[in-house]
Amino acid sequence: MTSSTAARQLGFEPFASTAPTELRASSDVIHAAYRQVFQVFGNDHVMQSERLTSAESLLQQGNISVRDFVRLLAQSELYRQKFFYSTPQVRFIELNYKHLLGRAPYDESEISYHVNLYTEKGYEAEINSYIDSAEYQESFGERIVPHYRGFETQPGQKTVGFNRMFQIYRGYANSDRSQGKNKSAWLTQDLALNLASNIQTPNFGKGLTGVVAGDRGQLYRVRVIQADRGRTTQIRRSIQEYLVSYDQLSPTLQRLNQRGSRVVNISPA
């Protein structure tokens, strides 16, 4: 359980202090659940004329469960207009994890699975794969409105999911469609390199300090022995050092290898 002070600093206090919404057949609760659903679905404003009145009616009459209601919303034209048509595929998958399972993707294999699923079976199969999953059933069941779970320790949750949740959650009042980076995926590099993401606070994107794999500001000292360039005899080879940023470390090592140089040591600068 996260302390109220930490929750306030990290920007998710409203979620930490609010119990999950369990839907029952009353108009007041349906209205509250509808607000929470679209708060989870990107926190984007839904006009009265855009509301899915037929789905609401089915829910209020008890003909469908909350899970079916969420399915109808996620497969609706409204959801597609907000998060699918103008959004890159990987970013769309990130948002589906956030909206429908309440967490961020853990690793690249989850992204690859959903890319292949959409390519082979289409949009509806992609949405159904989250809602029909065992994870959804265990977390929300038939009557609980999906909510953000990535801020708390959950059974079977990977620790890295906590950090990654803050990459795709940018504050309580933020909308997924208003984020400046909405036109590209947020986690591509960290997932591809299997790195833990920095925790970004909602205020001005300030990163919290600490030992985090993949710190983009870290410099490394690379010591190499130069190639002999075809000489048959050599008494001594000189050792050269390079100061390289984290982002340039891999390309630099590739270039040195192509030149025939031998890396003898890599250490933080």
Curated annotation (Swiss-Prot):
Q: Name one GO cellular component term.
A: phycobilisome
Q: What is the lineage of its organism?
A: Bacteria, Bacillati, Cyanobacteriota, Cyanophyceae, Nostocales
- Compartments it resides in: Cellular thylakoid membrane
Domain PBS-linker per the UniProt entry, residue ranges: 2-177
Give the family this protein belongs to, as stated in its UniProt record.
Belongs to the phycobilisome linker protein family.
Q: Which Pfam families match?
A: CpcD, PBS_linker_poly
Tell me where in this chain the CpcD-like domain is found.
217-269
Biological processes annotated in GO? photosynthesis
* Membrane protein topology class: Peripheral membrane protein
Q: What does this protein do?
A: Rod linker protein, associated with phycocyanin. Linker polypeptides determine the state of aggregation and the location of the disk-shaped phycobiliprotein units within the phycobilisome and modulate their spectroscopic properties in order to mediate a directed and optimal energy transfer.
Q: For this UniProt record, give its keywords in alphabetical order, as a comma-separated list.
A: Antenna complex, Membrane, Photosynthesis, Phycobilisome, Thylakoid
InterPro entries with a match to the protein in the record: CpcD-like_dom, PBS_linker_dom, PBS_linker_sf, Phycobilisome
Q: Which Gene3D superfamilies does the annotation name?
A: Phycobilisome linker domain
Task: State the protein's name.
Answer: Phycobilisome 37.5 kDa linker polypeptide, phycocyanin-associated, rod
What residue ranges are annotated as transmembrane? Answer: none
